[in-house]
């Protein structure tokens, strides 16, 4: 079996910082142009990590070949096969490409006295290295990524602000105050998303998903009614009275009544086939989630 060839050196652009597996002595010698390290076509050849002659660790220089193989198979027909030699060739090319682009972007950051390489730096480096044809599509991917990250930050920030407001007022968590404020949680938020997904089947069958929850003390009942086609779940918290008996009546369907039970309570099987039970417990920003029981009258 043909053995994999091992390289005892790596190429990095002149002036770029040494890679993680390069020793400080080798990097200093390369920058000074001595110590047995030569340069070729504007690139400095660094010795292997620490020992000079010892090659760098393979896992530090190359992407996992299994990942490379999976990516290659995505572009091939189902009956196509890939030789070991082709996998290793792509693995080495892609790994070296990452080193070249990162080194070029690092030079730009050093000139601008910045420590963090961002996506724009990498796209600039690819343009400098002659990959202009790929920069356009990658810019669109970068913009999509930033938009997704921005939306995620907005959702998390909005949920955190609502929780802080509840803590500050002390109406539902501190036991004081006669009413509870309504809270709107986006469907993409982890907990709200779980609620909307778990009740999606009920929305298909019953035309509406109903759930109730209690927050903090025992006098603030909260319920929601998710309309069809809506990705945002609106929670409303009417003031609980003695007559309501810890029940939340969800708008739009008068036959749906939600009863609250403690976390330690036992689950009861609903009579007939129409009753479905939902139980979950957790603690988020001081909000205590209680076991819920859904009854159909």
UniProtKB/Swiss-Prot annotation:
CDD domains listed in its UniProt record: HFD_NFYB
Q: Which residues form a coiled coil?
A: none
Whereabouts does the entry annotate DNA binding, in residue ranges? 63-69
Q: Alphabetically, which GO biological process terms does the record hold?
A: flower development; negative regulation of long-day photoperiodism, flowering; positive regulation of unidimensional cell growth; regulation of transcription by RNA polymerase II
A Pfam family found in this protein is CBFD_NFYB_HMF
Q: Which UniProt keywords apply?
A: Cytoplasm, DNA-binding, Flowering, Growth regulation, Nucleus, Transcription, Transcription regulation
The organism's superkingdom is given as Eukaryota
Localization annotation = Nucleus; Cytoplasm
Give the phenotype of cells or organisms lacking this gene.
Early flowering phenotype under long day (LD) and natural day (ND) conditions. Decreased plant size, number of grains per panicle, yield and dry weight per plant.
Function summary: Probable transcription factor involved in the regulation of flowering time under long day (LD) conditions. Functions as a repressor of flowering, independently of HD1 and GHD7. Controls flowering time by negatively regulating the expression of EHD1 and HD3A. Regulates plant height by promoting cell elongation in the internodes. Component of the NF-Y/HAP transcription factor complex.
Q: How does it assemble?
A: Heterotrimeric transcription factor composed of three components, NF-YA, NF-YB and NF-YC. NF-YB and NF-YC must interact and dimerize for NF-YA association and DNA binding. Interacts with NFYC2, NFYC4 and NFYC6.
Please identify the protein, giving its name as recorded.
Nuclear transcription factor Y subunit B-11
Species of provenance: Oryza sativa subsp. japonica (Rice)
């Amino acid at each position: 079996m043909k053995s994999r060839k091992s390289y005892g050196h790596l190429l990095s652009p002149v002036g770029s910082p040494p890679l993680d597996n390069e020793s400080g002595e080798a990097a200093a010698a390369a920058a000074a142009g001595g110590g047995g390290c030569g340069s070729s076509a504007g690139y400095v050849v660094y010795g292997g990590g620490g020992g000079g002659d010892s090659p760098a660790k393979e896992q530090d220089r190359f992407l996992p070949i299994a990942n490379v193989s999976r990516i290659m198979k995505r572009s091939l027909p189902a009956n196509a096969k890939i030789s070991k030699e082709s996998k290793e060739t792509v693995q080495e090319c892609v790994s070296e490409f990452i080193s070249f682009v990162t080194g070029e972007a690092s030079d730009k950051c050093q000139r601008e006295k910045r420590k963090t390489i961002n996506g724009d730096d990498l796209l600039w480096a690819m343009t400098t290295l002659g990959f202009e044809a790929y920069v356009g599509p990658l810019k669109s991917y970068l913009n999509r990524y930033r938009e997704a990250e921005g939306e995620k930050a907005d959702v998390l920030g909005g949920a955190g602000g609502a929780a802080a407001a509840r803590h500050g007022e002390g109406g539902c968590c501190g036991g004081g105050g006669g009413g509870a404020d309504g809270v709107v949680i986006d469907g993409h938020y982890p907990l709200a998303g779980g609620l909307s997904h778990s009740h999606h089947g009920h929305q298909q069958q019953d035309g509406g998903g109903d759930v109730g929850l209690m927050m903090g003390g025992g006098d603030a009942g909260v319920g929601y009614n998710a309309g069809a086609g809506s990705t945002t779940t609106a929670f409303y918290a009417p003031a609980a009275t003695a007559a309501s008996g810890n029940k939340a009546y969800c708008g739009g369907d008068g036959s749906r009544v939600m009863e609250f039970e403690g976390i330690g309570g036992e689950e009861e099987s609903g009579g007939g086939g129409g009753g479905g039970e939902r139980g979950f417990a957790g603690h988020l920003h001081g909000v205590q989630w209680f076991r819920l029981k859904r009854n159909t009258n």
